[in-house]
Amino acid sequence: MTIRYTGNAAYGYANSLYMALRESGAPPTELPEPGFLECLTTMPFGTDYLRVGRDLLVYFSSPLANPDQGLSTALDALGWECREERDGTPEAALARLGEAAARGPVLAGPLDMGALGYMPQHAQLSGSDHFVVVLGVEGERVRVHDPDGYPCVAMPAVEFLRAWRAERVRYAPTPYAMRSGFRQTRRPTREAMIARTLGAARAGLAADPGGPDRYGGPRAFRLLAADLRGAMAKRLVGHLTSFALPLAARRSHDAAAFLREAGHAEAAGLFERKAQCFGEAQYWAVQERWTDTADLMEALADLEGALIHALEPADASGG
C-alpha cells in the first residue's frame, strides 16, 4: 500500500517558496503542494557524491543544479516571476531586505545554518544551506518563518547577515541572495509544469561528472557502497542519518507521485522502491550496520540505472 507522507522534511526552499507564493496571492486551489514544488526544482532527480581526499559528502540530488538554481527553475515552470537581488555591502543588503519585506514576503537564501543561533544544533551545521521567509526587519533584529520548525523567530540582524553571507555554502556564488515581488505571469496546467520538468529530470538522473572528486548516476551509489564497507563509513554517519537519507526518502516518495501524475507508471514504481530503500538504510546507518547499508546502496544503483532507461524518450530507446 502507498500512502502519501505528510510530516517533517528538510524542504527548506520548497516550503519557503510555498509560503512566499501563497502570501503573494497564488490561488490556494492552484498552488501545488511543497512536494510537487520540490520536483519542479529538479533536485530529486540524480545523485551527487563528493569524494575529496578523506572528505566525503553525498547528496541524493541532481548534480546539474543546486537549490538556488532550482528555485528559478521552479518559478519558471509555475509561470511566476520575482525580483532577484544579491551581493552588495551588509548595510545595503539589510536595507533592501527591510524595504522588500515591508511590501511582501521575501525568500532569503541560501543561508549558512551554522550561523542561525536559534537552532539548537547550529554549531554542528556550519556550511549547510538553508532558506527562510523574511517577515520584516525590526530595528536591530530580523524576523523570519523558518520552515524547519521555527515560525516567527527573531534574531539579531548582525547574526542574520553572517548566515546570509553564506561564505561556507559551497554553491553560493554571491552573498545576500533574496527573491521578492512575486507575481504570476502565466497560468500553466500541472500537466504543462510536469512536461517542462521531465527533460531536466532525465538529465539529472543520467548525469555523472566522472570524478576524480565528484560522481553521479549509478556509479555514485556503487562508490558510496564501497566506502561504507571500508574505513570511511564513520565519516558519513552524521550527514547520512540526520539529513541525506531521510531527505532522499522524502524526495523519492514525492518524485514517485510526480511521475505517476505524468503517466510514467514504471518510473514512479522505481522511485517508490528507492524511497523504501532509503528508509531501510536509515535504520541500518543509525545502527552502524554498514554492510546492510552498503547492500541497499548497491540496490539503489540498480534502481537508478533502471530509472534512466525507463525515462528515456521513445526515440532514444528505439520505441
Predicted ranges, named:
Residues 111-116, 120, 162, 183-187, ...:
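Amphipathic, soluble alpha/beta structural segments
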Residues 16, 35, 70-73, 92, ...:
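Exposed alpha-helical structural elements
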